[in-house]
Amino acid sequence: MIYKVLFQADKTQSPLREATKSLYLEANSAVEARQLVEDNTPYNIEFVQELTGEHLAYEQESEDFKLTEF
């Protein structure tokens, strides 16, 4: 499954909606996706969302859509 992870780049600062970034990754569950990001980045994870169907197709049309591998 493909997940979209919304995050802040710095854990030491208060989250700002305007500074929220995203990455996409393939994992077996949302828990695994969160763990992969926590283990491999210094990011403050806000939300992990599974992408399926039309939502996945919409995200794949974006030029920012790239699967992250750790």
Curated annotation (Swiss-Prot):
Keyword annotations of the record: DNA-directed RNA polymerase, Nucleotidyltransferase, Transcription, Transferase
The protein's enzyme class: transferase
Catalytic activity: RNA(n) + a ribonucleoside 5'-triphosphate = RNA(n+1) + diphosphate
GO terms of biological process kind: DNA-templated transcription
EC number, as in UniProt: 2.7.7.6
Keyword Transferase: yes
Similarity comment: Belongs to the RNA polymerase subunit epsilon family.
Role description: A non-essential component of RNA polymerase (RNAP).
Name by which UniProt lists this protein: DNA-directed RNA polymerase subunit epsilon
Native organism: Latilactobacillus sakei subsp. sakei (strain 23K) (Lactobacillus sakei subsp. sakei)
